[in-house]
C-alpha cells in the first residue's frame, strides 16, 4: 500500500450509469465498444481502465491512449484522475474477488491511517500474458488532500 501522485493520463472510454448488480455482466460489452473504435483509430493504445466516479456507479470503461482525440459516438476522450491517491496491486489473473479484495485493502488502510477518500477510484489492468500469475491490476482511490 502506498500513496502516489497521479497525472491526468488520456483515455478513450464509454461513460455509463449502471448498478452494481448489472456491472459484472456489462463491462465487457462496454470495453468491446471502445476497442472496436480503437482498432480503426490512429491512436497509441495502452492498458484497459475502469473509473468509478461514485457509488451509483457512474463508470468510465476504456483504455489508455497516447493523446486526446475527437469523440466518436459513445466513445469519448477522458483522462484518469489526477492527484494524491492510495494504491495497491492485485496480483494474478483478474477476478471479481481479487479486485474487490484490493479495493477493501485500500479502504481499510486509508481508514487506519487517517486518509480521507473522495469516492473516486479506478483500476488499471496489466497487458495480458500467457502466465496469468504474473498479471497485475493497480487499484487507486483518490484522496481529498
Model-found features: residue ranges?
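A solvent-exposed interaction/effector surface
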Residues: 1-145
Amino acid at each position: 500500500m502506498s500513496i502516489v501522485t497521479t497525472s491526468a493520463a488520456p483515455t478513450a472510454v464509454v461513460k455509463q450509469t449502471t448498478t452494481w448488480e448489472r456491472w459484472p455482466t456489462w463491462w465487457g460489452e462496454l470495453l468491446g465498444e471502445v476497442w472496436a473504435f480503437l482498432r480503426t483509430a490512429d491512436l497509441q493504445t495502452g492498458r484497459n481502465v475502469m473509473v468509478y466516479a461514485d457509488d451509483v456507479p457512474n463508470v468510465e470503461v476504456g483504455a489508455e491512449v497516447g493523446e486526446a482525440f475527437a469523440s466518436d459516438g459513445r466513445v469519448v476522450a477522458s483522462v484518469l484522475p489526477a492527484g494524491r491517491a492510495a494504491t495497491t496491486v492485485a496480483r494474478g489473473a483478474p477476478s471479481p474477488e481479487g479486485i474487490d479484495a484490493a479495493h477493501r485493502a485500500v479502504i481499510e488502510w486509508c481508514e487506519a491511517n487517517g486518509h480521507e477518500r473522495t469516492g473516486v477510484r479506478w483500476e488499471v489492468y496489466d497487458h495480458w500474458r500467457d502466465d496469468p500469475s504474473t498479471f497485475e491490476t493497480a487499484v487507486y482511490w483518490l484522496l481529498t488532500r
